[in-house]
Amino acid sequence: MKIKLAKTELIHFIGIGGMGMSGLALIMKGKGFRVQGSDISINKNIERLKKEKIKVLIGHKKQNINKATILVISSAIKKNNPEMLEAIKKQLPIYKRGEMLANIVSLTKNIVVVGSHGKTTTTSLIASIFQETKIDPTIINGGVICLLYTSPSPRDGLLSRMPSSA
């Protein structure tokens, strides 16, 4: 699925504090999009997003999406979420995290690590090889890789570790 996005879009992530959603928000910001989001409580991912100057609203209220033009939702979001209901009422495009991730991945060459066990470790090893050889891909990983920058950034290539729930 190709998602047409303009840099003027304001992408609102419902459930932005999750590992996958926070990483996706950072990548979209790094690609030049305006990004904000909401979650039910503060966690380390949200603190990291705020350091990167991403607006994060605590709690789910329909007012949170007043200026949003696109929504990205986590799989944890229920259909009766007030932000989701307001987006439906406003006829805003709503994408699942996996759909937005697939759109990003479709724009570049990729290495994808899949399997039952060891995906984060394998992705980390590949990332360290790239770092040592001065290849500079965007890395999407289900865990935090300590040897790398804490924020993803847009590159020409992409290394992705697909979570089981993608």
In which residue ranges do the predicted regions lie?
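Phosphate-binding loop of NTP-binding sites
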Residues: 4, 27-33, 50, 63-64, ...
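Hydrophobic alpha-helical segments, chiefly the membrane-spanning helices
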Residues: 162-166
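ATP-dependent carboxylate-amine ligase
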Residues: 1-45, 50-57, 67-71, 87-92
